[in-house]
Amino acid sequence: MADNIAITVLGAGSYGSALAVSLARNGHPTLLWGHQEDHIKRLQADRENKKFLPNIKFPELLTPEVNLKVCLAATRNILLVVPSHVFALVLQQIKPFLTPQHRIAWATKGLEAKTGRLLQEVATDILGQHYPLAVISGPTFAMEVAKGLPTAVAVAGSESKFTQDIAALFHNNRNFRTYISDDFTAVQLGGAVKNVIAIGAGLADGLGFGANARTALITRGLAELTRLGVALGAKESSFMGMAGLGDLVLTCTDNQSRNRRFGLALGQGKGINAAQIEIGQVVEGYRNTEEVYNLSHRIGIEMPICEQIYYVLYQDKAVKQAAMDLLSRSPKDE
């Protein structure tokens, strides 16, 4: 492995590119790989990601690289920033090139498709238990990270040394703070469920329900996230942090969120395909909705908001009817 490369980022979309830019600005030589060779070659030529992060110039220490084997041989620190539905596929791609020295982190927000398993379980299944694992999650929009605007995230993992090392790579005293969490499950889960609730917030606003309804939805969405997390062994208090409440509020209230905009379009009467085309990038919450629904039903946890969003997206339920069914539920203790 090369001595000078600090980390390789796998995933050259908006968020992967933004995190790579941030790492390089922190003084860490960084490689950036993506599955489309022509896209990486454009990044090499343009020294920016014009498609996803226009006008953000790459620092000198950031190098786009087309060869996956070269990227993995250059450093032991690997960061996956790919959609959750291809997370397992990318792990299978890199597995032949891994050595016992490698350490695997991800900033992917989601669960395994169909099963709803945590990505930690997916990684362990594919790679075995030898490799240290870590996750980075929190209230972050790619463009704001790329611009160097103040940002804070949570980092959690299977091994404290690696968790601390990843946190240190991102942390600086100017605009990027990292908070280390000891709750690996909570930090993984928050990023998936908040995407679903953000679609719901968009749906509510698209229907014209107003700020009261949006706030109620966020609050009850946090309750659903917490209930699911505790059932999986997470601590209730963990969901009040960056990867829980922080990410939930950001994604539900700002139109930089693809998930919120997707829900907004649906609430205004557009179809699923038309809404996805309008967004123009992956809407993680669409798949996350099915993942969370499957997980909650598998372990028997009631999540009425997520359930109604699932019915809208996957069973053609009318948006207004889903809203009415939520509003007509029997009163209950908070």
UniProtKB/Swiss-Prot annotation:
Sn-glycerol 3-phosphate binds at residues 109, 138, 140, 194, 247, 257-259. Catalyzes the reduction of the glycolytic intermediate dihydroxyacetone phosphate (DHAP) to sn-glycerol 3-phosphate (G3P), the key precursor for phospholipid synthesis. It is found in: Cytoplasm. The active site is at residue 194. NADPH binds at residues 14-15, 35, 109, 142, 258, 282, 284. It catalyses: sn-glycerol 3-phosphate + NAD(+) = dihydroxyacetone phosphate + NADH + H(+); sn-glycerol 3-phosphate + NADP(+) = dihydroxyacetone phosphate + NADPH + H(+). PANTHER family: GLYCEROL-3-PHOSPHATE DEHYDROGENASE, GLYCEROL-3-PHOSPHATE DEHYDROGENASE [NAD(+)] 2, CHLOROPLASTIC. This is Glycerol-3-phosphate dehydrogenase [NAD(P)+]. Keywords: Cytoplasm, Lipid biosynthesis, Lipid metabolism, NAD, NADP, Nucleotide-binding, Oxidoreductase, Phospholipid biosynthesis, Phospholipid metabolism. Belongs to the NAD-dependent glycerol-3-phosphate dehydrogenase family. Its EC number is 1.1.1.94. The gene is gpsA. Pathway: Membrane lipid metabolism; glycerophospholipid metabolism. It holds the Pfam family NAD_Gly3P_dh_C. One of its GO terms (molecular function) is NAD binding.
